[in-house]
Amino acid sequence: MPAIRVSRATRALLLSVSLVLIWPAATAAARPAPNSMAVAGDSIARAFNTCWFPYIDCVANSWATGTSSTVNSHYRRILASNTAISGRNSNDAKSGVKMVDLPGQMTKISARNVQYVAADMGGNDICTSTTGAMTSVGSFSADLRTALSTITGNTNVQTVYLTSIPDAYQLWSIFQTNSSARSTWARFTVCQALLANPTSTAQVDVDRRQQVRAHNIELNRAIETVCAEFAAKCVFDGWAIFCTAFATSDITTRDYFHPSTAGQKKFADVSWRAGPFVATPTARLGPDCNPATND
């Protein structure tokens, strides 16, 4: 058999391909640890209902800026490697707010000139009295865009991290058979768009719950999309929080709605591992994830 002649150009190409195949992939670079931070958001960021005294904010337990060693917040994790952030952890979230309130929070935070801004927002935009009262995708996106334009325009701000809205449908799924949860939801009219008539199997109620979950997903898509418009500074959690399963212990039994201290700890851990300060964040997921398999 005659020898096969390989040109110099072909040999060079084969060598380059071989190097690509055998050379280890570069590890994604984590963003530098910030010297200051703040959090915007709603009652989750305020760690509502996690203190010994009920029905108050408990910012020491916040997943983002809290000081509790039990929760091990983003602030504490950063502090462990960068003591310059000590005492520079502002919680500017407010219980009960919606996305329409985020631009105002970001204006306030911008004046602080912090380097890292975390935000969780959107739970109250889906957890309304009726499905008709849920915030539209258009309004939600516009308000988020305004907020991000404000905060990313501050040259001191290096990173803005947005977490996905938790999968609220899980509340119904894990507590629908719990009589205490059902009575609490009814007495305090908790998230009635989703949690009204929790034991009903009537098609109208089944459809209503699915409508809320679908809107939950739509608003998370909006967060992902708008964040990408500010990609130089904005980081989305890749659906990590949405795709995380709740255990009953992760939800406070005071209202069967807000994260317990254990829930804040889980929120902190999941969001940190998916976030901007780790070299290899957890894999990006998506709305088709099954939270039961992504704990």
Functional labels for PLM-detected ranges:
Residues 12-24:
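Bacterial N-terminal signal peptides
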Residues 53-149:
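Conserved SGNH/GDSL esterase-like catalytic core that processes O-acyl groups on lipids
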Residues 36-48, 87-93, 115-120, 125-127, ...:
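Structural recognition of the beta-strand scaffold that forms the well-ordered cores
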